[in-house]
Curated annotation (Swiss-Prot):
GTP binds at residues 166-173, 191-195, 212-215, 279-282, 308-310. Mg(2+) binds at S173, T193. This is GTPase Obg. GO terms for biological process: ribosome biogenesis. NCBIfam families: Obg_CgtA, PRK12297.1, PRK12299.1. It is an enzyme of class 3 (hydrolase). Belongs to the TRAFAC class OBG-HflX-like GTPase superfamily. OBG GTPase family.
């Protein structure tokens, strides 16, 4: 399935049905009086977060969503039928924005969460409502209220506990494939990963979700490479895993490039808890490894873990470091496991 994280939709709620002008016509009743019914209410347009979805690709093929209008009122005080609602099923983590793409209407972060996008119009009153002591036979009724029309944007930000960041070919996809059942495309050329990938990772009996996004390069915030459009998918992460290619000539420069791009995208993202790991250590001799680790620690001002996604050396230590930062922010129910009953 193709990945799409931004879609434009046009929604319109149903208009209310018109009220009816009608009079009671019955044998032996000379002045039956008004009996026109009210119009039915128009249908609403809703958005609902649905589990199991992870792309907005469905909205590439259908952009227009119109709810049904209410039925018109009828004689004998019969109210028109209400119009059917229409529901847009979107992935969990979808933001709904106004046409300007800046004003956030809603952020659907929980399965089953719903938000009203366009309210249906009320039905018009039939002539029965206008009967009074001075007007015993009103000959007018209200039209129904028109529906609401809106142009909206849907923007998906995947929800993951940990987000992978790094330059192209830093080994992010290899790492994700090594620790989860995710099978991202892996090759020895830049930008092999063209869209985010999710994987469920387990360590010491705990599980969490990890997101791998396309690599960043210098100037990504200005549109170079694939730009920084995918950073939104790690914006919700509780911790970032910054992978640095140990075979690079200047690991400190590589780390600085990523930190600069994170800061340019969002200062809040740059301040997130972060684990830094020097990858591909299986390709380095001990002396070079020690030099590059020291240079990287001096650049970031903190400890650097060593690992190899290919040989899996040091992978467990990295996962434990991630979990130690994820666990405090987890709700107790999120990590509760079913245990056998004990008397």
């Amino acid at each position: 399935m193709k990945f799409l994280d931004l879609a434009k939709v046009y929604v319109r709620s149903g208009g209310g049905g018109a009220g009816c002008v009608s009079f009671r016509r019955e044998k032996f009743i000379e002045y039956g009086g008004p009996d026109g019914g009210d119009g039915g209410r128009g249908g609403d347009v809703w958005a609902e977060a649905a589990p199991g979805l992870n792309t907005l690709i469905d909205f590439r093929f259908q952009q227009h969503f119109f709810a049904k209008s209410g039925g018109h009122g009828m004689g004998a005080q019969r109210t028109g039928a209400s119009g059917d609602d229409i529901v847009l099923r979107v992935p969990v983590g979808t933001e709904i924005l106004e046409e300007d793409q800046e004003t956030v209407i809603a952020d659907l972060t929980e399965p089953g969460q719903r938000v009203l996008l366009a309210k249906g119009g009320n039905g018009g009153f039939g002539n029965l409502h206008f009967k009074s002591s001075t007007n015993r036979a009103p000959r007018h009724a209200n039209p129904g209220q028109p529906g609401v029309e809106r142009t909206l944007w849907l923007r998906l930000k995947l929800i993951a506990d940990a987000g992978l960041v790094g330059l192209p070919n830093a080994g992010k996809s290899t790492f994700l494939a090594a620790v989860s059942n995710a099978r991202p495309k892996i090759a020895d050329y830049p930008f092999t990963t063209l869209h985010p990938n999710l994987g469920v990772v387990g360590v010491d009996g705990h599980e969490f979700v990890m997101a791998d996004i396309p690599g960043l390069i210098e100037g990504a915030s200005e549109g170079r490479g694939l730009g920084d459009q995918f950073l939104g998918h790690v914006e919700r992460s509780r911790v970032l895993l910054h992978l640095v290619d140990g075979t690079a000539e200047d690991v400190a420069l590589d780390a600085r490039t990523i930190l600069t791009e994170l800061e340019a995208y969002s200062p809040a993202l740059a301040e997130k808890p972060r684990v830094t790991a020097l990858n591909k250590i299986d390709a380095l001799d001990p002396e070079t490894l020690a030099e590059r680790r020291a240079a990287l620690e001096a650049e970031i001002g903190g400890p650097v873990l060593l690992m190899s996604g290919v040989s899996r050396e040091g992978v467990t230590e990295v996962l434990r470091a991630l979990w130690s930062r994820i666990a405090p922010s987890r709700k107790p129910a999120e990590d509760r496991e079913d245990k056998p009953w004990q008397p």
